[in-house]
Regions:
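Positively charged, solvent-exposed patches that mediate nucleic-acid binding
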Residues: 1-106
Length: 106
């Protein structure tokens, strides 16, 4: 399964301004209804300085998303990494599971 990524600047701005926000450390989620599901992964250079570490985290987040987020229908989703350190995959998966449980209730 491939990931349909969110790239349109207007859609990204709308998501961050009007989207529903949830924080499950080390991740922050923005979610808004849309016609087709798209996802955005964001990790700040200020928090994780080394590109190798940022890319590894993004790969881990994408793998978890593909594995567990088949429920994400008709929503744009932004996943923002908040921690100042590199988390392990288990911690990321737990945060993603919490957000999945939260949005399945809606």
């Amino acid at each position: 399964m491939s990931i349909n990524t969110l790239k349109n600047k207007k859609q990204i701005n709308r998501l961050f301004k009007k989207g529903k926000t949830s924080i499950f450390f080390p991740l922050m989620f923005y979610c808004i209804e849309s016609k087709e599901p798209k996802v955005l992964f964001s990790i700040s250079k200020k928090k994780i300085a080394k590109a190798v570490e940022r890319n590894k985290l993004k790969r881990q987040l994408k793998a978890i998303y593909v594995e567990d987020f088949s429920w994400n229908l008709n929503k744009h989703l932004a996943i923002v990494y908040l921690a100042n350190y590199v988390c392990d995959a288990i911690e990321l998966k737990e945060a993603m599971q919490k957000i999945k449980d939260t949005y399945e209730k809606d």
